[in-house]
């Protein structure tokens, strides 16, 4: 390892306030040319057509003054806010890419909400080698990162393929491709030919029927305004769910962040454990069963099945119709559908024996998908750990 010299970051990087480069309008469009940046994970938050105040003295590092997150930038840009510093490397001492990579492994407590660069972060000392040695280290880091990125891209494609496969499984299941041809003896009010003319052909033992004929559907209740009035939650003991908690639950909802007290319960409704929850606003067509008695707002619909339909069958069918239900939502800031849309949703109905068979076939395939996805997620986590390991070795002179 050649001799490395210690410097404070402020000796290696000069800073500039971002104020002249802050975007004036948040009317972003992918059709516009200039990216608007944040130093956080989102990085490019949109594109602007503004032509003044574009930063173009490149390359630079943008530094989030509150979280200490950084991004390396080698293209003209504007910024979202003043919550950052624009850092320029002293190229007589350090390569911009080298110091950027070095900053990725600095351990720093940023739990206090304040600006850090001037008083604290810039005082951190790091060791750097000669410029030729820096070039070699950067080249080796990027060679290894390129190999790692190729692997990560393959893993991400695998996850995308799994999502496509899941939808294909659901599509085939509700077109009767897994059928064992049990005869449906139940006489119900079937959907008309007009209502089903654009729907897939299903086995002759099956019939199409509106979801409202298979169970009771009802919106949750949260009548009081404002909805976050503290008195609703005083002495809370009744779980109050949000659409995000339905989405996060996957199958059974047992976790929640809010609880109604008696005042809250009086203006709501307590739904029993086992109710199928279906979201109709923000997160559309997310489903999960209540693992507890709970209240929920009118952005969630509760479904209670009749004796001739299995709730798991309905849950999987709603999952298969997610894109279709999204299409019913008007083009507003927050997507939503109404109760009528769910009530009139046409469901392929079959005997209870067949429903059990469909559920088993779906869940067997989904279990395989889940196991593969867990393996992929572990590999992605390992790839990120490997990235940190590469950087650590690089700056210990071990690459």
Regions flagged by a language model, labelled:
Residues 8-12, 67-128, 211-216, 247-254, ...:
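Basic, amphipathic alpha-helical recognition segments used for DNA target recognition
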Residues 8-58, 69, 75, 79-83, ...:
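Sequence-specific dsDNA recognition surfaces
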Residues 172-173, 179-198, 202-203:
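Intrinsic disorder at enzyme termini
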